[in-house]
Swiss-Prot record:
Source organism phylogeny: Bacteria, Bacillati, Bacillota, Bacilli, Bacillales
InterPro entries for the chain: DUF2929
Assigned GO CC terms: plasma membrane
Protein name: Uncharacterized membrane protein YjzD
Bilayer disposition of the protein: Multi-pass membrane protein
TM stretches of this protein: 4-24, 34-54
Highest taxon, organism lineage: Bacteria
Record keywords, A-Z: Cell membrane, Membrane, Transmembrane, Transmembrane helix
Gene coding for it: yjzD
Location of this chain's protein in the cell: Cell membrane
Length: 61
């Protein structure tokens, strides 16, 4: 479930960022390019999440 939610958020946020950048540069918004960027970002986030070490010793305050 976390993979699906992560993909949805990555998809939405990357599309909003691409729309904003395209709007600021006075160029047309391209859905296909934004989708490719979203998939690449999703893969990078998932790879980094698996590579990064988890803190197994949770401190209790």
């Amino acid at each position: 479930m976390r993979y699906i939610i992560a993909f949805i958020w990555t998809f939405l946020l990357s599309h909003m960022a691409c729309y904003l950048v395209a709007s600021m540069n006075s160029v047309t918004y391209n859905f296909k390019t934004s989708s490719v960027i979203a998939v690449v970002l999703y893969v990078l986030i998932m790879v980094l999440a698996e590579i990064m070490p988890m803190n197994k010793n949770a401190s209790q305050h």
